């Protein structure tokens, strides 16, 4: 018998399978909608979507014991690199109808894949834009509570800082999934992560750093706060 329990993070749930294994899930904001072929569980009249950590860096971080998760019900999120919406759909479940996600994506082709999802998930606003040029979408994005960045570029840290300068509320949080090989393939990942942490700490208070293996090789997730 499958069982669903509340996770320590509001809006996230733990699904305990028959064999005792645990997975994370979110309560489906749009019952009946599957976004990326994920498994769906029915429990006490509600529908829960299993959050696959192999397909989502944020999901991987939670599975790896993330301590700080500023994405909560009712919060506004600027999502840099929203892609086709795998992770964003779970964030959409969490923030709910009271929250909002402003999703920036550079590729028109990829953004088109998001359209059928957002037709029903009205709390996601898809925006075609370049995360390296935050002023481009100033007319569309207000000040937000959280910025989440998943952009595999050498200037990852600068992208977060530049967007936080324009869009992040004081006291707001940033989360960034850093792929060391996108920054410098010649250096050891640990060295790259230290350099990124140093760069981030010049603008933010760095609260947490977490390795994403075994789900993502050479990746770390940083949680930072704008003071």
From Swiss-Prot:
S-adenosyl-L-methionine binds at residues 86-87, 105-106, 130-131, 150-153. CDD domains: AdoMet_MTases. InterPro entries: Fibrillarin, Fibrillarin_CS, SAM-dependent_MTases_sf. Keywords: Methyltransferase, RNA-binding, rRNA processing, Transferase, tRNA processing. Its EC number is 2.1.1.-. SMART domains: Fibrillarin. It is an enzyme of class 2 (transferase). HAMAP family: RNA_methyltransf_FlpA (MF_00351). This is Fibrillarin-like rRNA/tRNA 2'-O-methyltransferase.
